[in-house]
Curated annotation (Swiss-Prot):
Gene3D superfamilies: 2.70.40.10. Substrate binds at R68, S69, G70, N81, L85, I86, D87, M95. The gene is dut. It comes from Janthinobacterium sp. (strain Marseille). Signal peptide: none annotated. Belongs to the dUTPase family. It comes from the Bacteria. PANTHER family: DEOXYURIDINE 5'-TRIPHOSPHATE NUCLEOTIDOHYDROLASE. The keyword Metal-binding applies. This enzyme is involved in nucleotide metabolism: it produces dUMP, the immediate precursor of thymidine nucleotides and it decreases the intracellular concentration of dUTP so that uracil cannot be incorporated into DNA. It holds the Pfam family dUTPase. This is Deoxyuridine 5'-triphosphate nucleotidohydrolase.
Amino acid sequence: MKTIEVKILDPRMQEQLPAYATAGSAGLDLRACLDAPITIKPGETHLVPTGLAIHLADPGYAAMILPRSGMGHKHGIVLGNLVGLIDSDYQGQLMVSTWNRGQTEFTLNPMERLAQLVIVPVLQVGFNVVEEFDTSERGIGGFGSTGKH
C-alpha cells in the first residue's frame, strides 16, 4: 500500500483520519470538520473544511474528491464542482464544495461523512500536432453515435 503525507489541521481529526470502510473500498471517507451544524437550503452551496491537508508529492498521482452515493441519492447533496481534483503538488486544506440540489433543507453535522477521497494514477502527456488523424472505427462520431442499446 502506498502512503501519502497528511497534515492534521484540526485536532478533532486526530481520531477521525480518512479510512476505507471495507477491504474493497476505493474511496476514503472525508468528514465535515465543522464547529456547529450548518443548514444548506435547496440550491445553496457551502465550502466545507475537512480539517486535513495532503501532499501526494509524486506527479504520477492525483486525488479526486467524489460524492458519497447515499448523500446524493437520499438527500440531494452533491459536489458543487462535481469532482474535486487535487494536484500532486497541492498542500492546502482539502475542502468540499457542497451543493444541495434537492428540494428540502439539509443539515450537515460536525464530523459527518460528506465525501470520499480517491487516489488515482496520472499520466502527463505532451502533444504531437498533426494535420489529420489515422482513420479509426469511430471517427468523429460523438454523443450517441454508437447506438441506443
